[in-house]
Amino acid sequence: FGPKYLNSSDSVLYKKNRNLYFTKEFISSVKKKGYAILVEGYFDVLSLNQLGYSNSASPSGTALTIQQLEAISRYTNKILLCFDNDEAGLKATERVLEIKNQVSNQLEIHCLNLPEKYKDISEIYEENGDIFSDILKDNLEIIEFLIDKFIESTSDKKSIFNYFMKI
């Protein structure tokens, strides 16, 4: 099997690092709800739209950029991240923490904690979309989320200390 998503290369007309994938209702929905939901892939955006969350967008992969955060921050300062429940999603979340203050120290970025058995939003939608509203309520500030994930992954106190010093 090939990759789940095959993204276009950059061209004169398309610059991936400046674009987000979303439906036409995104901007009005973000303004109405007061927050945006960022997910990893196209199918996640479509799944959330089916669940009534048209305030969702995707950077078309895990590489969220400063330019994309700036674009979203024009409409809201509250962002809920829900990247895939895997190592790449976790690394992408760490990167968002690194770049968020370059955009604005007013940005509030929280993370949704997917149940372990689900890889992403589209799996939740396929199996049990009704639980998403509970997942949405149970969000953590990005730094709390990353600390929790790191502590879950290691019992080595030195590694934990070094991680805290890094963030």
Description of each model-found segment:
Residues F1-Y75, K91-T93:
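Phosphate-handling DNA/RNA-contact segment within nucleic-acid enzymes
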Residues K16, L38, S58, T62, ...:
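Hydrophobic alpha-helical scaffolding
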Residues K24, E70, E94, K119, ...:
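Residues on a specific face of well-ordered alpha-helices
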Residues E25-K32, N105, I143, I160:
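Hydrophobic, secondary-structure "cap" segments at the distal end of domains
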Residues Y35, N77, L140-E144:
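Generic structural signal for secondary-structure transition and capping sites
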Residues T62-L80, D148-F164:
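A compositional/structural signature marking long, glycine- and acidic/polar-rich segments
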Residues L64, S73-I135:
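Conserved phosphate-handling catalytic cores of large alpha/beta enzymes
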Residues I109-I167:
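C-terminal or mid-to-C-terminal helical accessory/interaction module adjacent to the motor/catalytic core
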